[in-house]
């Protein structure tokens, strides 16, 4: 039985990964969840999973050396998958120290505890030997690469290599807003305290591989969307505000471009890297879904308005009239400091080496996401506490 220590699994991507692994492997795996349950982590997200006999939940900080050492000694996980991180750019601007402590020092503590537990001696050449079948996977972001140019005002056809065409199985109508893309060899150039902290975590992970020979991988993903996304992020924030009849805040003119990846596709990629990724390698995970922020907002407005008209049972969720759900709700607010113009991942490496591709087109994934939020308002209410309301006012009220 393979054992996974998954940190930050009460958060968005970590929770979806745990759900994916349990669905795929059922009782053939054991999962230990370590989560400090900060603002973006909520036990309701994994309430069904932690009731299973093969799942153990532990509340705690990844920076707690004694706790992490004890967990690894007790459970002897084959894989450590580190999702635990402070992960919102706006919050990093107001409190950068917290991001450095959690994202860099917390990651280093996990690495050190794993290194001590998995070390088995040295080979004839003096190289460290670690327990067979063990691996540390650092979950990172495309934001470590900085910003790309937006070369086109409107989307243009995205051309992919013949190798990738053989993998993506019929995904067509791919588009792009630029001529350059992040690859695994793109120089790291973070532009916010959040991305700088994630860069530091990546570098210390790579250093543990180069210095100590630790078995590691790093994955860097584009923007995720899907169920259980905390409502400070763009898509769930827009959904929530539409239902509440609030304005829809959009930074600048909404021209910034992101590559959107459905979270279940991301979970599948992580699983493939864990089992088949070459030790020491970095893998970019992208969605082939470049969209401008303003177009995301308009799409969400259009879908919710259609659902409300065609399926009136959902109108009970509204605090406004159906006819008020329109683009007039959009409010352009002062742009974020250092707002990166465009992110775009080139996932050729993981496609060619591991056979992974993002199966979910944005047109399908966004409707699934919206319907999940409409059907799970109890979860939304459970995570939007008074602290969330104070944060929302701080971020958007004075920027209009």
Name each model-derived stretch.
Residues 37, 98, 223-226, 256-257, ...:
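Short histidine/acidic/glycine/proline-rich micro-motifs that form metal-
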Residues 8, 12, 135, 192, ...:
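Amphipathic alpha-helical recognition patches that constitute DNA-binding helices
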Residues 16-20, 25, 31, 60-63, ...:
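C-terminal substrate-binding subdomain of Rossmann-fold SDR/epimerase-dehydratase oxidoreductases
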Residues 226, 230, 259-262:
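Active-site helix-initiating loop/hinge in glycosyltransferases
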Residues 1-224, 264, 274, 341-342, ...:
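N-terminal Rossmann-like NAD(P)+-binding domain of SDR-like oxidoreductases, especially those catalyzing
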Residues 49, 151-153, 231-239:
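A glycine/serine/threonine-rich, flexible loop-to-helix segment
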């Amino acid at each position: 039985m393979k054992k996974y220590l998954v940190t930050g699994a009460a958060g968005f991507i970590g929770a979806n990964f745990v759900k994916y692994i349990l669905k795929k492997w059922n009782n053939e795996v054991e999962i230990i969840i370590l989560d400090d349950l900060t603002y973006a982590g909520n036990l309701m997200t994994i309430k069904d999973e932690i009731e299973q006999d093969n799942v153990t939940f532990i509340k705690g900080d990844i920076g707690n050396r004694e706790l992490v050492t004890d967990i690894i000694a007790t459970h002897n996980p084959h894989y450590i998958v580190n999702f635990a991180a402070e992960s919102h750019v706006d919050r990093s601007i107001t409190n950068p120290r917290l991001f450095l402590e959690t994202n860099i020092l917390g990651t280093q503590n996990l690495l050190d505890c794993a290194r001590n537990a998995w070390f088995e001696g040295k080979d004839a050449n003096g190289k460290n030997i670690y327990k067979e079948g063990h691996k540390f996977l650092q979950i990172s972001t495309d934001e470590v690469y900085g910003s790309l140019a937006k070369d086109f005002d409107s989307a243009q056809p995205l051309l992919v290599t013949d190798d990738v065409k053989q993998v993506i199985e019929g995904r067509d109508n791919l588009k792009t807003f630029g001529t350059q893309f992040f690859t695994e060899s793109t120089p790291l150039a973070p532009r916010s305290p959040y991305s700088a902290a994630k860069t530091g975590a990546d570098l210390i992970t790579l250093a543990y591989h180069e210095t100590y020979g630790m078995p590691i991988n790093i994955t860097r993903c584009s923007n995720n969307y899907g169920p259980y996304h905390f409502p400070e992020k763009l898509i769930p924030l827009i959904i929530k505000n539409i239902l509440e009849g609030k304005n829809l805040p959009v930074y600048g003119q909404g021209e910034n471009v992101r590559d959107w990846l459905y979270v279940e596709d991301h979970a599948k990629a992580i699983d493939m890297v864990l089992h088949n990724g070459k030790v020491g390698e970095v893998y970019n995970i992208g969605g082939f879904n470049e969209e401008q922020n303003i177009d995301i907002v308009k799409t969400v407005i259009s879908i919710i308005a259609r659902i409300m008209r065609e399926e009136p049972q959902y109108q009970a969720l509204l605090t406004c009239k159906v006819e008020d759900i329109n683009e007039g709700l959009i409010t352009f607010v002062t742009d974020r400091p250092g707002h990166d113009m465009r992110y775009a991942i080139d996932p050729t490496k993981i496609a060619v080496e591991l056979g992974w591709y993002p199966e979910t087109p944005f047109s399908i994934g966004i409707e699934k996401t919206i319907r999940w939020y409409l059907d799970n308002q109890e979860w939304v209410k459970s995570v939007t506490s008074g602290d969330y309301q104070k944060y929302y006012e701080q971020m958007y009220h004075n920027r209009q």
